[in-house]
UniProtKB/Swiss-Prot annotation:
Assembly information from the UniProt record: Interacts with RDM1.
Tissues in which the UniProt entry reports expression: Expressed in roots, inflorescences and at lower levels in leaves.
UniProt name for this protein: DNA (cytosine-5)-methyltransferase DRM2
Annotated source species: Arabidopsis thaliana (Mouse-ear cress)
Function: Involved in de novo DNA methylation. Controls asymmetric and CpNpG methylation. Required for FWA gene silencing but not for the maintenance of SUP gene silencing. Functionally redundant to CMT3 to maintain non-CpG methylation. Involved in RNA-directed DNA methylation (RdDM). Acts as major DNA methyltransferase in the RdDM pathway, and is essential for RNA-directed de novo DNA methylation of cytosines in all sequence contexts. Associates with long non-coding RNA (lncRNA) produced by RNA polymerase V (Pol V).
Length: 626
């Protein structure tokens, strides 16, 4: 029996770009890791290129390296731990080893508590020592003000305050970086916080102009890691010349799959000349309990169903990606929706589909919309100065024990005060927002557990638990999944159309978000043909199918290449066709959180979108011809 748990932003679209030969996660991190704010333990030097090359030769995964780095661990300690434990151990073993190094360093340190406190906040050690000498070790507020003030800060531009970091409805979404130099906005010459961010970016190797423009563009609420995302993406795209020169249209690369589709004589529309803009608010054709509901749209005759199709991917992609996706899916514009209107967590996604949009309804019971509703036990410990009511997007990795310890260390000196100083509050809130931390005790912020993520995303309790799936795999699979309540709202229109059941072709199924949505809508699944490369994910769907007593047939393929045109036609002949083709190609090459291989639809994973198009074309041709 399935138990439902009812109790409880990657900021700018970058022009299409080509991946750099020097684009492994290890190399990219070496370029910018040394002075990241909030690093767990200061290091004397970075891993050498030879050392990181050795890690690759040992067979260590770039993706795991990137995950460990994003959790706040220094590159030197990651490299040391990998060499000690070997490349093939669980990520948790490597984390435990790094934690041991951290404890040893702290035990042998002779630095004062004040120095440790501000080093943990990411300030430069030399400046911390100087500030303590000037103001005294006990005057923490004066030390903080000194560290946050510098001559450069007096001449740096202030950030523009915008909702969620960036106002996506701005008219300059599609403009180039030259616009940043021509802003007429009023500048605050005394932005100490922004000055600190810019100094950190300069130490990481960016120019002062690049850093200040990034801060101005991304907004004052953006943390250092997200600013680095923006700058690294632009550098890898070789687009920094656009800070200074007029934009020149570049011809995108076309891989074999793209040429295959574009060589069929499909007309090229003006969509490339009119970039798709992300709406604010991101509510698509409407969401429950919000104004602005749209109940009618026009679709090209060729695009109308049945069969129906539903394609999902991340909203914040490199520039030009959604135009390309739309062009290959009958010129249908995407419906952009942020799942914060359906649950407690944000999740900005784009959906291209040919479903009706009238008479949508929400599955019951509705999810929890606020943090305190979703986590009622946290309310007792929630500081008044933490004003969050929503969580950010669910990530594929989670905050480390060292991070939560740094937060505890930062707060404990102020236990007898009404609240900590503003600079401590800012640091803690930044980390809580980045890693979706919730308060579980006094000075104790903790990352979400997998079962809590399942509830937020609309899955049944224990959906990903057991069956050979590790915690790391659970985080990754949940972070890449559908938000079930959002998808179910869109698919709800199918219930009256298929009262006796539906045949589904599910591509890149993951942990079965689409299937869970249909089940919760009480739409009978007569047939599901699923394509999913991960064995543990396939097992999760199979377990769900059995536990919910589905009477239809589940057929699973492990590789999209196995679903040949002949195979598809054979399945359609046997089962009578498909009513819905649902899926979303792997988005690792599109997601803003991916600093290294964010290469748009040219990426090895994201190019699988063209396989979605191939299969949809076969299904539609067969059903239209029958």
């Amino acid at each position: 029996m399935v138990i439902w748990n009812n109790d409880d932003d990657d900021f700018l679209e970058i022009d299409n770009f080509q991946s750099s030969p020097r684009s492994s996660p290890i190399h990219a991190m070496q370029c910018r890791v040394e002075n990241l704010a909030g690093v767990a333990v200061t290091t004397s030097s970075l891993s050498s290129p030879t050392e990181t090359t050795d890690l690759v030769q040992m067979g260590f995964s770039d993706e795991v390296f990137a995950t460990l780095f994003d959790m706040g661990f220094p590159v030197e300690m990651i490299s040391r731990a990998i060499k000690e434990t070997g490349p093939n151990v669980e990520t948790s073993v490597i984390i435990d080893t790094i934690s041991k190094y951290s404890s040893d360093c702290e035990a042998g340190s002779s630095k004062s508590k004040a120095i440790d406190h501000f080093l943990a906040m990411g300030f430069d050690e030399e400046k911390v020592v100087k500030a303590i000498q000037e103001h005294g070790e006990d005057n923490m507020e004066a030390i903080a003000n000194a560290l946050l003030s510098c001559p450069e800060a007096k001449k740096l531009p202030a950030a523009v305050e915008e909702e969620d970091g960036i106002d996506w409805s701005s008219s300059d979404d599609d403009t180039n970086y030259t616009d940043m130099l021509n802003s007429d906005d009023e500048k605050d010459p005394n932005s100490n916080e922004n000055g600190s961010k810019i100094r950190s970016l300069v130490k990481m190797g960016f120019s002062e102009l690049e850093a200040s423009l990034a801060v101005e563009r991304c907004g004052e609420n953006v943390d250092i890691a997200e600013l680095t995302d923006f700058l690294c993406a632009a550098q890898m795209a070789r687009e920094f010349s656009e800070f200074y020169t007029e934009h020149e249209e570049q011809k995108p690369r076309h891989n074999i799959k793209k040429r295959r589709f574009e060589s069929k004589g499909e007309p090229r529309s003006s969509v490339d000349d009119e970039p798709i803009r992300l709406p604010n608010p991101m509510i698509g054709f409407g969401v429950p309990n919000e104004p602005g509901l749209i109940t009618h749209r026009s679709l090209p005759e060729l695009a109308r169903g049945p069969p129906f199709f539903y394609y999902e991917n991340v909203a914040l992609t490199p520039k030009g990606v959604w135009e390309t996706i739309s062009r290959h899916l009958f010129e249908i514009p995407p419906e952009f929706v942020d799942s914060k209107y359906f649950c407690v967590a944000a999740r900005k996604r784009g959906y291209i589909h040919n479903l009706p949009i009238n008479n949508r309804f929400q599955i019951q019971p509705p999810p929890k919309y606020t943090i305190h509703d979703a986590f009622p036990l946290s309310k007792r410990w929630w500081p008044e100065w933490d004003k969050r009511t929503k969580l950010n997007c669910i990530l594929t990795c989670t905050g480390s024990a060292q991070l939560t310890n740094r937060i505890r260390v930062a707060l404990e000196p102020y236990n007898e005060e009404p609240e900590p100083p503003k600079h401590v509050q800012r640091y803690v809130i930044d980390q809580c927002k980045k890693w979706n931390l919730v308060w579980v005790g006094k000075n104790k912020a903790a990352p979400l557990e997998p079962d809590e993520m399942e509830s937020i995303l609309g899955f049944p309790k224990n959906h990903t638990r057991g069956g050979g799936m590790s915690r790391t795999e659970r985080f990754k699979s949940l972070g890449n999944s559908f938000q079930v309540d959002t998808v179910a709202y869109h698919l709800s229109v199918l219930k009256p159309i298929f009262p006796h059941g539906i045949n589904v072709l599910s591509l890149f199924t993951g942990i079965g978000g689409g299937e869970v949505a249909l089940h919760r809508l009480q739409i009978k699944m007569k047939l599901v043909v699923s394509v999913e490369i991960s064995k543990v994910n396939r097992n999760i769907l199979k377990d769900f199918w059995e536990q919910t007593n589905q009477t239809g047939e589940l057929i699973e393929f492990s590789d999209i290449q196995h679903l040949t045109n002949d195979t598809i036609e054979g399945l359609m002949e046997k089962y009578g066709g498909f009513d819905l083709v649902i899926g979303g190609s792997p988005c690792n090459n599109l997601a803003g959180g991916n600093r290294v291989s964010r290469v748009g639809l040219e990426g090895d994973q994201s190019s699988l979108f063209f396989e979605y198009c191939r299969i949809l074309e076969v299904v539609r041709a067969r059903m239209r011809g029958s």
